[in-house]
């Protein structure tokens, strides 16, 4: 008889193994599976494990040349999702050998590469994954991390303040630099290129870099504080991106930026390596994330993209606000905020954390709260995000009736007032508006901002 039995067979015979004990070296994934009508959950979960590891749709004779038991993904647990009809969380374990070291790109190609178009599934979402410590150690991670950044900038004991320069498209380089200078002069720590400011006909990248560097140094000289502007190095090719990073380094600026999802993980990891080698901080914007993470039942949760970014490398990453114009539930957001900045995060399903994650001292990433926030949100933001964060007010700075610099002053005064109140033991959640009102008595800039945006 032939060595193998040809034909299509049920995945669950090979890939559903409820008795499997997960290894410390396994990569674990939690998928939200919505099977097609009539497909049992075990078969759907096994199909995910198979298609994202060694499986193919039929038995092949070359299976005999390898050890499936060593290399196959295994669906080791399935649980129904409370309150949802025909939705399950399928837990899959992947042997470490399936993944190339230090490659977020390969990790994603394996885990989420093919399986999302699978016919037996109506929808599939990767909710969380556990990166084993052995695999974490193959990545450089963030170029510098939270502590090194504070030391470079000499800023301690408070969140950092930023502002995206608007209008995002159409300013000339010189006017853009002027807006940067005014914000930094007023008291912000950072200003930011918008994510879609790359190198367009109305403002080429080199001109922008030059005028922004000039703005930085002028503001630094006048305030005695270290200032930064996130120079967006995102480009059409990796070579061009590195060229921009090199020019930023030659100007001596402290920080550059990258759009990591549109730019891609390979480009991002290269840039992160360059940044560590050359003392540049790296700010990461998440343009395109909602394409991947907005649907509740299909795609990937942002916490997965955030963990991947920590492996690939970035010192700041945008993470929603909990308040403001973009959606984000508080506990869930705080869950992935801790995932990117803490060293050990315990499993906690109420915060959306499916696995305990040990980062074995990989540097942390500062979460960036940005999008529709203004001075009245400051107490809540300070309380929710704590000191290790960057609070970014675009319109909330530039929309000030007296101009950019007074807008920056208003934000800085509000922040310092909240930090002081917190340090004095006051309850920011309860007394927030009162704290801002008190501070505005001493700051006409803040008082004007309080008028424009009502609490």
Curated annotation (Swiss-Prot):
Substrate binds at residues 114, 164, 168, 286, 318, 370. The active site is at residues 166, 285. The basic functional RuBisCO is composed of a large chain homodimer in a 'head-to-tail' conformation. In form I RuBisCO this homodimer is arranged in a barrel-like tetramer with the small subunits forming a tetrameric 'cap' on each end of the 'barrel'. RuBisCO catalyzes two reactions: the carboxylation of D-ribulose 1,5-bisphosphate, the primary event in carbon dioxide fixation, as well as the oxidative fragmentation of the pentose substrate in the photorespiration process. Both reactions occur simultaneously and in competition at the same active site. Its cofactor is Mg(2+). PANTHER family: RIBULOSE BISPHOSPHATE CARBOXYLASE, RIBULOSE BISPHOSPHATE CARBOXYLASE LARGE CHAIN. One of its GO terms (cellular component) is chloroplast. The disulfide bond which can form in the large chain dimeric partners within the hexadecamer appears to be associated with oxidative stress and protein turnover. Mg(2+) binds at residues 192, 194-195. Belongs to the RuBisCO large chain family. Type I subfamily. Heterohexadecamer of 8 large chains and 8 small chains; disulfide-linked. The disulfide link is formed within the large subunit homodimers. InterPro entries: RuBisCO (IPR033966), RuBisCo_large_chain_AS (IPR020878), RuBisCO_lsu_C (IPR000685), RuBisCO_lsu_C_sf (IPR036376), RuBisCO_lsu_fd_N (IPR017443), RuBisCO_lsu_N_sf (IPR036422), RuBisCO_lsuI (IPR020888). Binds 1 Mg(2+) ion per subunit. The modification N6-carboxylysine is found at residue 192. The record marks 325 as: Transition state stabilizer. Keywords: Calvin cycle, Carbon dioxide fixation, Chloroplast, Disulfide bond, Lyase, Magnesium, Metal-binding, Methylation, Monooxygenase, Oxidoreductase, Photorespiration, Photosynthesis, Plastid. Pfam families: RuBisCO_large, RuBisCO_large_N. One of its GO terms (biological process) is reductive pentose-phosphate cycle. This is Ribulose bisphosphate carboxylase large chain. It is found in: Plastid, Chloroplast. It comes from the Eukaryota. It catalyses: 2 (2R)-3-phosphoglycerate + 2 H(+) = D-ribulose 1,5-bisphosphate + CO2 + H2O; D-ribulose 1,5-bisphosphate + O2 = 2-phosphoglycolate + (2R)-3-phosphoglycerate + 2 H(+). GO terms for molecular function: magnesium ion binding; monooxygenase activity; ribulose-bisphosphate carboxylase activity. It comes from Erythrina crista-galli. Its EC number is 4.1.1.39.
């Amino acid at each position: 008889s032939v060595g193998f039995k040809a034909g299509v067979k049920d995945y669950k015979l090979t890939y559903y193994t409820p008795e499997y004990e997960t290894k410390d070296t396994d990569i674990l994934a939690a998928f939200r599976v919505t099977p097609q009508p009539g497909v049992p959950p075990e078969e759907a979960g096994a199909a995910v494990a198979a298609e994202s590891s060694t499986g193919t749709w039929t038995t092949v004779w070359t299976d005999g040349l390898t050890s499936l038991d060593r290399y196959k993904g295994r669906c080791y647990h399935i649980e129904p999702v409370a309150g949802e009809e025909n939705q399950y969380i399928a837990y899959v374990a992947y042997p470490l050998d399936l993944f190339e070291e230090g490659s977020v790109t390969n990790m994603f190609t394996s885990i989420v590469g093919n399986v999302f178009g699978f016919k037996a599934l109506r929808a599939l979402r990767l909710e969380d994954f556990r990166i084993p410590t052995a695999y974490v150690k193959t990545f450089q991670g963030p170029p510098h991390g939270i502590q090194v950044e504070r030391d470079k900038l000499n800023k301690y004991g408070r969140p950092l303040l930023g502002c995206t320069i608007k209008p995002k498209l159409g300013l000339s380089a010189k006017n853009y630099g002027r807006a940067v200078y005014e914000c930094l002069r007023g008291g912000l720590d950072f200003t930011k290129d918008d994510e879609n400011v790359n190198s367009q006909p109305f403002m080429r990248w080199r001109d922008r870099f030059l005028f922004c560097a000039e703005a930085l140094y002028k503001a630094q000289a006048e305030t005695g504080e270290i200032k930064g502007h996130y120079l967006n190095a995102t480009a059409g090719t990796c070579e061009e991106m590195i060229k921009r990073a090199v020019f930023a380094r030659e100007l001596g600026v402290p920080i550059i930026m990258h759009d990591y999802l549109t730019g891609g993980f390979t480009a991002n990891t290269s840039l992160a390596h360059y940044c560590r080698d050359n003392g540049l901080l790296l700010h990461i914007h998440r343009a395109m994330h909602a394409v991947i993470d907005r649907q509740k039942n299909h795609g990937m949760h942002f916490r997965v993209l955030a963990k991947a970014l920590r492996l690939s490398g970035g010192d700041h990453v945008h993470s929603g606000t909990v308040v403001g114009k973009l959606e984000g539930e508080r506990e869930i957001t705080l869950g992935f905020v801790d995932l990117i900045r803490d060293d050990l995060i315990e499993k906690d399903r109420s915060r959306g954390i499916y696995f305990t994650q040990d980062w074995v001292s990989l540097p942390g990433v500062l979460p960036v709260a940005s999008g529709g926030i203004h001075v009245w949100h400051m107490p809540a933001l300070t309380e929710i995000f704590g000191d290790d964060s960057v609070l970014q007010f675009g319109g909330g700075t530039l929309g000030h009736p007296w101009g950019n610099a007074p807008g920056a002053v208003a934000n800085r005064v509000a922040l310092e007032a909240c930090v002081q109140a917190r340090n004095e033991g006051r309850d920011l959640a309860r007394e927030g508006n009162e704290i801002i009102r008190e501070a505005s008595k001493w700051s006409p800039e803040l008082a004007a901002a309080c008028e424009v945006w009502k609490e």
